[in-house]
Amino acid sequence: MKKTAIALVVAGLAAASVAQAAPQENTFYAGVKAGQGSFHDGINNNGAIKKGLSSSNYGYRRNTFTYGVFGGYQILNQDNFGLAAELGYDDFGRAKLREAGKPKAKHTNHGAYLSLKGSYEVLDGLDVYGKAGVALVRSDYKFYEDANGTRDHKKGRHTARASGLFAVGAEYAVLPELAVRLEYQWLTRVGKYRPQDKPNTAINYNPWIGCINAGISYRFGQGEAPVVAAPEMVSKTFSLNSDVTFAFGKANLKPQAQATLDSVYGEISQVKSRKVAVAGYTNRIGSDAFNVKLSQERADSVANYFVAKGVAADAISATGYGEANPVTGATCDQVKGRKALIACLAPDRRVEIAVNGTK
């Protein structure tokens, strides 16, 4: 049975197209399943029954056919992880006791269960999952007369008892709306028979039931996933006149520079995932070494101000370029006198702030 079920599922997977493994979040699904179950352990816990089975006249049929329906709600499906709540109703099958080839007793079980199902996508369209929950199981006990095999209604009983339910399995999305699954499920300590003549005495017979099932489910609301628009990129550049921001030849911010920098910070703060680059420049007056040092110190002063306002230190850089990239070009080449030259070269003394990020 197991090999056949696995072969059918694998064959289906080979012919299937790739789809999302778990259902989309906040959607429902419903399905059916069937397979083979087996009763375990409980029969060996009853000394009288165990002794009887040692005789060749007795036989215990533990294997059974199982089937059920289920429905679920997909709570989460993010980063390959999924979480769903699943409700189902199963016929968990029946065990039969025979004596001399005739039916002696039957133990039948069916009921509803509620479980949480956690899943992980291991391949495109393929999930492995585990379930844990509780099942309310009705167990019916039927007995038959020794002589003619007719049912003995006086001994018959039924109980309703909660049992732990656990399962592991794999699920494959053949289509976004259609999935197949193969799982192994087990119930713990099912039923507890009490004879009619001694209702306060429980026979020590409460097996657990394991079953392997193949199922198919339909997923509602599995249209194409909404396309998330890529964030719009934003690039902004600000140029600050150093004569307004700094004293000539100095790297300390002037008091009046605060208003200008606060205005720039207001623009920066509107950019998400931002990266800020501060570049300092000087004019050509003075040595190259001094100009590079001064431009670096000015860039650092501006960057430190923005960090103090709230820009992450690892999201901002400061670089001094000295007299590189002058904006005046050859405009001031014919200017005579130091004061006049300083005034003409004022546009070269600047701090540029480049901001890149998203809206």
From Swiss-Prot:
Biotech / industrial applications: Immunization of chinchillas with this protein provides partial protection against subsequent infection, suggesting it might be a useful vaccine candidate.
Q: For this UniProt entry, which residues form the secretion signal?
A: 1-21
Protein family (similarity comment): Belongs to the outer membrane OOP (TC 1.B.6) superfamily. OmpA family.
**InterPro entries for this protein:** Bact_OuterMem_StrucFunc (IPR050330), OMP/PagP_b-brl (IPR011250), OMP_bac (IPR006664), OmpA (IPR002368), OmpA-like (IPR006665), OMPA-like_CS (IPR006690), OmpA-like_sf (IPR036737), OmpA-like_TM_dom (IPR000498)
The entry summarizes the disruption phenotype as follows: No fimbrae seen on bacteria, the outer membrane blebs significantly, bacterial adhesion to human oropharyngeal cells decreases about 65%, significantly reduced ear infections in chinchilla.
Q: Name one GO molecular function term.
A: porin activity
Spell out the subunit comment. Answer: Monomer and homodimer.
Recite the other comments.
Non-typeable Haemophilus influenzae (NTHi) is a primary pathogen in otitis media (inflammation of the middle ear).
Which stretches are transmembrane? 27-37, 64-75, 83-91, 110-121, 126-134, 164-173, 178-185, 211-219
Q: Which cysteines are joined by disulfide bonds?
A: C332-C344
Q: Which UniProt keywords apply?
A: Cell adhesion, Cell outer membrane, Disulfide bond, Fimbrium, Ion transport, Membrane, Porin, Signal, Transmembrane, Transmembrane beta strand, Transport, Virulence
Organism listed in the record: Haemophilus influenzae
The places in or outside the cell where this protein is found are: Cell outer membrane; Fimbrium
**Where is it chiefly localized?**
membrane
Q: What does this protein do?
A: Acts as a fimbriae subunit, allowing adhesion to host cells. With TolR probably plays a role in maintaining the position of the peptidoglycan cell wall in the periplasm. Acts as a porin with low permeability that allows slow penetration of small solutes; an internal gate slows down solute passage.
Gene Ontology process terms (BP): cell adhesion; monoatomic ion transmembrane transport
Q: Which CDD domains match?
A: OmpA_C-like
UniProt domain comment = The extracellular loops are most variable in sequence, and in some bacteria confer sensitivity to phage and/or colicins.
Q: Mind telling me which GO cellular component terms the entry cites?
A: cell outer membrane; pilus; pore complex
Q: Which residues form the OmpA-like domain?
A: 233-359
Q: What is this protein called?
A: Outer membrane protein P5
Q: Where are the residues marked Part of salt bridge gating mechanism as a site? A: E86, R181
